[in-house]
Amino acid sequence: MGREFIPLFEDWAATYDATVHGADKQYAAVFKGYDNILDSIVALSGSNVLEFGPGTGNLTAKLAAANKKVFGVEPSPSMRKLAADKLSDKAVFSDGDFLEFPAPPFQIDTIVSSYAFHHLTDEEKRTAVKQYGAILQKHDKIVFADTVFKDHEAYDEAIKKAIRNGYHQLADDLKTEHYPTLGTMKNIFSEEGFAARFTQQNDFVWIMEAIKR
């Protein structure tokens, strides 16, 4: 369920914000256009938002600044504390993950996440989307930004390129986490009752907007 990655995020919490803004060159391409990507999620979101994996609260802050109500579900205690400190009383945060989480304290119309859905296996991704379909009403939506590959060949090439560049930590991440292909995500959303569109943001990240039919 992605909780095996909690130790990683406990260690990363203190330097995460620096990483997303380019401090670690290995991940510079992954986080290229980071603020614009988050702004796009905000623009596509409704008024009442359930956010999975808010991390240090960067997307949450943008959602709150746009006067959206946000319930954040974050499994990492260190990340959750940083987010709560950053947002003060502008959002509510709770322990949980993509598959096991408390009921939001209000009726949601949008589920969002940034740079986190790949912590689930493809089977778990399907289970999660099925769950969300049971929560959302018709025309409500899921808006996720995450690394997705056009096909398996593109995934393999990304690993080779990382190794060629000496980015061995990035290569290891690509090998060990559960990055999906576009085809996989299209099938999951379609088969679980969503009409989805995908917009590429950089060499790694796509925004997935899935509207419940």
UniProtKB/Swiss-Prot annotation:
CDD domains: AdoMet_MTases. One of its GO terms (biological process) is methylation. SUPFAM superfamilies: S-adenosyl-L-methionine-dependent methyltransferases. S-adenosyl-L-methionine binds at residues 53, 74, 97. It is an enzyme of class 2 (transferase). Transmembrane segments: none annotated. Coiled coil: none annotated. InterPro entries: Methyltransf_25, SAM-dependent_MTases_sf, Uncharacterised_MeTfrase_YrrT. Keywords: Methyltransferase, S-adenosyl-L-methionine, Transferase. Belongs to the methyltransferase superfamily. YrrT family. This is Uncharacterized methyltransferase RBAM_024380. It comes from Bacillus velezensis (strain DSM 23117 / BGSC 10A6 / LMG 26770 / FZB42) (Bacillus amyloliquefaciens subsp. plantarum).
